Amino acid sequence: MDMAGVSRVALPYLRFVVTACACGVGLVELGPTSKASEHFWVDLRGEARLAISDNSLLTIKDRTPDVVLNMSPGINVRWESKRVRGGIDYALDYLYFISDKSADYRHSGFATIDAEVIKDHLSLNGRASLRQQFLDQRGSITNSFANKTDNRRLIQNYTGSAILKGGLRDIADYRLTYRYGLARTPADNLDDLTLPVNFSDTNSSEFVASIGSGNRFNNFSWRISADSSRVMRSLNVNDFKNEHIAGELTYKFNRFIQIFGSTGYSRNNFQADVLSEDGRTWNAGFRWTPGRKLDLTVSTGKEGQREVWYAALQYFFSARLDFNGTYQDTLSSNTIVTNDSLQGFTFDAEQGISNQSGLPIDETDPIFTYSDVDFRRRNGRGTFTLRKKRTTFYATGNIEWRTFDDSTGTAVSWGISSGFDRNVTENTSIKGSVGYRQSRFEGQFRIDNYIEANLDWTTELSRYFRAAIGLSHSERQSNEAGADLEENAVTFYLRGTF
């Protein structure tokens, strides 16, 4: 491999490791001094996969079957102490396609770090992610790795935040939050004609400050807040800016119900009249908690010319079955959405990186095409989770409308999916999932229906070795001629941990 090839493979890894380690080293010095309270684990691993695909080039016609060999060294590092909890997982995949004897390298990694620097006052956290993702939802997409397409590229995301909070005796409390984000991709290279779409590298800054009533105020409380979000882009396109200042009053009738309302001022630099804001805003709603099982919040208001709604519902049917649902209406960008998603991920010793619902993260790609165009995001989702001794089952549904700031219209995507993870024996497990999604693209009459299904069987051969067999199916049915796509794959997998 020439030096350019070495740099292409090594640079994302180096950036990922340097960023994660910089956060980790800085936080190590701030952690507890008692060595007995610290725990550190390092697991090296090697993985070998043999995958058989019936459409390795993800083409509509003349599908090419292929056998793909995948060798993947990796490392997992975890660290826990009284004030710091962190994890890093990184793997470099080498893929060899037997049909044309070509090779490819792919990075994947995730890092989390959470630290309480000053107890009850100052906390820091960071997230880093390396993922291979499909850039254009109109292009070639699948849920299998055993293929190659120009639509799949490495996306790097890094976020770090600091939260400072405290109180002025029992009269007032304050909270300051700052979050910085970086997004790096090859898609800002306008000279690369193999890219299906172009969009910028970004630097983002998000700041929220609030001061409110303290413990002295029981039934009646107040809060004043201000926030600013900015995204700076590398290409010559419009940057994202959104700012608010507001005052809120809350009245608690009893321990079951409370009402709240706010008024303030907002402004942004959106171009479309329906999305542009420079004036007064208001919001009103209630929170209802009749018992330990139910927590419901609903609010409505107006920002600019937009009527906005917010809702959040959590209901515990039993200790094993619960439901979480949310709906929100915000102005956002791809960078802000990614930062929010990363911030909700945590490291679980048994499941690895988990999402806000405590489930393993969904490695499927974003449901909208990457772009530099900002948008109004109306998003609703709900998840049922059932946990038993050996089995976890989930069913989830979501819908999202995105109205773009370039007057191309509104894109809509909705989907449902379900899955399970069962420990058959102490050493053997099986998990599966099935999902359906429909996407209506902005500015077009194109409608895509996407179906995917996965089934994986895993067994531990010994303390250090694990074997697995996986089946996957991906299918896209579109009303646009020549856009249908299908792939089936079988994967044999062997993993050694050292």
Language model features with spans:
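Cleavable N-terminal export/targeting peptides
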Residues: 1-39
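Gram-negative and organellar
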Residues: 31-498
